[in-house]
Each structure stands twice: as structure tokens, then as C-alpha cells.
């Protein structure tokens, strides 16, 4: 099945492969599919450095078997320079595939090359990456909202105790102060909490 996400023709890829003949074949397939090759790297250990240098839209890795070092590089990359990653390998061991996906690979393809297959793999990786990013950002948004809520609740309690007002009035005071300072309510609440901790000796 061909998955076509109508990727722009200026999409750039970083190619990682220590096999010269296979690397040349990948270059040909990727260019036939309309992708630009930002760079091709022979040493998988240079993955993070090469990504920071060339800033590709996605990364294509081809290897006989993904090494522990390569998987570590992928995990480090996805912490600092998140990109869709497509890994082609001759290793069809399910455990290896699971380790690769856990490290941050978006599409793991057992080698068997053709131009259409390479293009489909890249398209699928972009789709998987976007879905994963959407979920990751939603999780971060929820976690941030929960942290902010706890901060605001504590600040309201401090204001209520110090000023002898009810919860609604305390929140209104927080909101008004945030508006005057062009800050988020949680930021003002955090300032109040920090000041209270300093004055009461809480570390």
C-alpha cells in the first residue's frame, strides 16, 4: 500500500549508512522520490552531531543491525533534536525492533529495497512522528495545567489567609495582578508562593 502525504519537494533528509554501495542506492531511491539529501554520513555515532549541523527534516538510517551505540544516539537525538527517523535493517528480530521504536525510531523497515518502498517508509515515518508529537504536546499541556493549578491553589490559600478574603476574591486579585503585569496567573501565583517561602523560611 502506498501512503502519500504529499510531502513538499524541498523536504531534506540526512542519510546514515556505513555501506558505500547501499548508501548510493538509497541516495538514488530518495532522489527519485523527490527528496533532497542534506548530507550522507558513514559513521552512525555521528548522528547527533550531523543532525545539529545539517538540520534535516527527517533522518534515514540503514544498517545491517542497529548497534547499542546507534540506539543510544537515536534516543539522545530525540531528546534534543526531535526528527522523524526511518531505520532500514537486515535484523528482523522483534526485540530489536521494539528497542529501536523505544529509542525513537518512527518506522523500522526490514531491508528489501525499492524506490516505492523507501518513499512509503518515509511517508509513514512523518505520519507517525506527527501523531506522536501531537500526543506528546498534549501530555505536556495537561501536565503543565496540573502544575499551574496546584501553584494557583496554594497562592490563593496564602492570599486568603493573609487578607482574610474568600477564594473568589483571592482568585480575582491574582487575575487582576496578572493582567496589570502582562503575566500568566500561574506566574504571579508562583511569585507569591516563592515570596511566602522566603519570608517563612521554607526551602
Positions of PLM-derived features:
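A short, hydrophobic beta-strand element within the central beta-sheet of small alpha/beta folds
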Residues: 82-92
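Short hydrophobic/Thr-rich beta-strand motif most characteristic of the beta2 strand and flanking loop
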Residues: 34-43
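C-terminal output/effector regions of signal-responsive regulators
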Residues: 140-203
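Conserved phosphotransfer microenvironments
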Residues: 23, 43-48, 57-77, 93
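Conserved acidic segment of CheY-like receiver
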Residues: 7-21, 26-30, 59
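C-terminal output helix
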Residues: 95, 113-122
Amino acid at each position: 500500500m502506498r501512503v502519500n502525504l504529499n510531502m513538499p519537494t524541498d523536504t531534506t533528509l540526512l542519510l546514515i549508512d556505513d555501506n558505500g554501495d547501499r548508501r548510493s542506492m538509497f541516495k538514488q531511491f530518495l532522489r527519485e522520490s523527490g527528496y533532497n539529501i542534506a548530507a550522507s554520513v558513514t559513521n552512525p555515532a555521528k548522528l547527533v552531531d550531523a543532525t545539529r549541523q545539517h538540520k534535516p527534516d527527517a533522518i534515514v538510517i540503514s544498517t545491517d543491525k542497529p548497534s547499542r551505540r546507534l540506539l543510544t544516539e537515536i534516543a539522545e537525538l530525540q531528546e534534543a533534536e526531535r526528527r522523524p527517523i526511518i531505520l532500514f535493517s537486515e535484523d528482523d528480530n522483534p526485540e530489536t525492533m521494539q528497542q529501536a521504536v523505544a529509542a525513537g525510531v518512527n518506522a523500522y523497515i526490514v531491508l528489501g529495497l525499492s524506490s516505492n518502498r523507501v518513499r512509503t517508509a518515509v511517508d509513514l515515518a512523518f505520519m507517525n512522528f506527527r501523531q506522536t508529537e501531537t500526543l506528546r504536546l498534549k501530555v505536556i499541556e495537561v501536565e503543565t495545567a496540573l502544575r499551574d493549578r496546584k501553584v494557583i491553589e496554594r497562592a490563593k490559600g496564602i492570599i486568603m489567609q493573609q487578607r482574610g478574603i474568600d477564594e473568589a476574591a483571592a482568585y480575582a486579585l491574582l487575575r487582576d495582578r496578572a493582567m496589570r503585569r502582562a503575566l500568566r496567573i500561574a506566574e504571579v501565583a508562583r511569585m507569591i508562593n516563592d515570596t511566602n517561602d522566603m519570608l517563612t523560611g521554607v526551602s
